[in-house]
């Protein structure tokens, strides 16, 4: 399991190895004599980045087998060894862009075909985004019957576009309207255990529609289709950075708010105990050095994929898969390798994703695409693409000339929080179990969390950690 799609947690005690695919089960069934302690560094990393490092858990004594590795336990010596059997390739293809695009599409189609073998009832999560449009394009082009699923407020861009697609391509759409978001609080403990306490609670949103999906044979999920085919935050400077400088440059970039970090450097230094002032940057460099055989642009992609992807997105899929088979075409090994080999310059600004849709799935390209609060158009209708490009500039938050389009996760979610969750969040903050430890500056913590409209991840991570501590210590 080279991407850790199935987690394995373990510890050694009195010359025996104990392991489980469930973190909480492993804790619940441990011997009373086996003492566990809170992993303070993991707590800080989670608060800072909304994710974990590839082996971290919230318990010092319990580890997780990292991606692309196998674990062996020697019964005679009672020692473990972890060996790597897969790693990222440092090669970038020299093929023409046209040939690369053709190969990516061939591998994409093969990947979906494997997910659908023997499956009669097929579902996909439909939104206005690129991931679901790519899946939709394949199903429509092959005339495969399926059911679409969408959830959220009725006036969100994603919901509006999902309904447009359903009408245009004549598929059944199951829509779950969010009149409120109380399900976050009501199902908190259930969802925390399902995700091994490794997901900020605001990322629990896919679980609210599982009951509607439970009769499907498979749900095609778009996670990871975008990771390397859009070259997330691609920067030209990475093309020419020498390897001996790449670790330091990329570590500094990841330390900035927005790249990889929820907290900016100033906020982090205020919140974290002084003894941890250099912990995050030093940890980044240590982890990046493990991958420094890669050229700079691939080093950036690999690190982002591993920690934001395998440790942030995968818990959603792991939890959902306990109810229904959630298939990830984006993690098919042949598809992954095909996209990985493409130079970053071909993937920037969603170029490859747009060309994939325009060249092979034109039928679904005439409906607008949604990126947060921005709209893309890649269809053939004259003038519409130019119109949306102009609107994108006029509505950009940086300029504020026109009001931006409906941005649920960036704006409207806070109205729901204030209506449905604010008293609960305030109470959780006041009684946060991390305040009983010294790795945080308590006054600064309370001051930071008293602010209005913090990044969602700040609420999500702190509440999950606190409730984990209360349950297990």
Name what the model sees in each region.
Residues 1-183, 190, 217, 465:
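Cysteine-centered catalytic environments shared across enzyme families
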Residues 6-9, 27-29, 81-82, 228-230, ...:
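Short helix/loop capping segments that flank catalytic or ligand/cofactor-binding pockets
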Residues 55-57, 202-212, 448:
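Short alpha-helical segments and helix-capping/turn motifs at coil-helix boundaries
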Residues 62, 216, 256-473:
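Adenosyl-5′-phosphate
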Residues 66, 99, 103, 107, ...:
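Generic recognition of stable, solvent-exposed alpha-helical segments in well-folded globular domains
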Residues 97-104, 195-198, 298:
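Residue-level preference for long, well-ordered alpha-helices that form the structural scaffold
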Residues 116-117, 209-212, 320:
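A short acidic-Thr-Gly-centered motif at the start of a beta-strand
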Residues 154-210, 223-248, 253-257, 293, ...:
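ATP-dependent adenylate-handling ligase core
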């Amino acid at each position: 399991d080279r991407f850790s799609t199935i987690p394995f947690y373990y510890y050694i005690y009195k010359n025996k190895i104990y392991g489980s695919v469930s973190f909480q089960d492993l804790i619940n069934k441990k011997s009373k004599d086996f003492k566990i302690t809170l992993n303070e560094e993991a707590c800080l990393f989670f608060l800072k980045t909304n994710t974990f490092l590839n082996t971290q858990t919230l318990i010092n004594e319990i580890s997780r087998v990292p991606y692309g590795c196998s674990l062996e336990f020697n019964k005679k010596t009672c020692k473990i060894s972890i060996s790597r059997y897969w790693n990222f390739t440092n090669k970038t293809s020299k093929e023409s862009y046209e040939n690369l695009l053709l190969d990516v599409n061939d591998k994409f189609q093969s990947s979906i075909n494997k997910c659908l073998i023997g499956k009669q009832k097929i579902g996909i999560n439909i939104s206005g985004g690129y991931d679901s449009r790519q899946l939709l394009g394949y199903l429509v082009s092959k005339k495969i019957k399926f059911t679409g699923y969408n959830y959220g407020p009725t006036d969100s861009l994603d919901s509006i576009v999902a309904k447009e697609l359903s009408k245009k391509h004549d598929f059944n759409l199951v829509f779950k309207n969010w009149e409120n978001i109380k399900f976050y609080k009501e199902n908190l403990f259930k969802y925390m255990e399902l995700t091994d306490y490794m997901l900020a609670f605001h990322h629990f949103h896919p679980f609210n529609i599982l009951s509607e999906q439970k009769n499907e044979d498979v749900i095609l999920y778009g996670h990871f289709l975008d990771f390397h085919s859009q070259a997330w935050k691609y920067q030209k400077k990475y093309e020419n950075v020498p390897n001996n400088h790449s670790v330091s440059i990329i570590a500094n970039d990841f330390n900035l708010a927005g790249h990889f970090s929820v907290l900016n450097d100033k906020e982090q230094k205020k919140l974290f105990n002084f003894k941890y002032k250099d912990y995050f940057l030093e940890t980044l460099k240590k982890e990046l050095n493990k991958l420094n055989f890669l050229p700079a642009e691939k080093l950036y992609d690999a690190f982002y994929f591993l920690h934001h992807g395998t440790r942030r997105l995968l818990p959603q899929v792991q939890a959902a898969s306990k109810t229904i088979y959630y298939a990830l075409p984006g993690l098919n090994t042949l598809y992954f390798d095909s996209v990985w080999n493409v130079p970053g310059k071909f993937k920037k600004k969603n170029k490859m994703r747009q060309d994939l849709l325009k060249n092979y799935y034109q039928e679904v390209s005439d409906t607008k695409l949604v990126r947060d609060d921005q709209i893309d158009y890649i269809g053939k209708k004259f003038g519409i693409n130019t119109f949306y490009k102009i609107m994108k500039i006029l509505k950009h938050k940086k300029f504020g000339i026109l009001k931006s389009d409906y941005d649920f996760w960036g704006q409207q979610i806070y109205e729901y929080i204030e209506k449905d969750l604010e008293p609960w969040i305030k109470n959780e903050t006041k009684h946060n179990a991390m305040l009983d430890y010294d790795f945080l500056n308590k006054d600064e913590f309370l001051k930071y969390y008293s602010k209005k409209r913090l990044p969602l991840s700040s609420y999500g991570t702190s509440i999950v950690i606190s409730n984990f501590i209360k349950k297990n210590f």
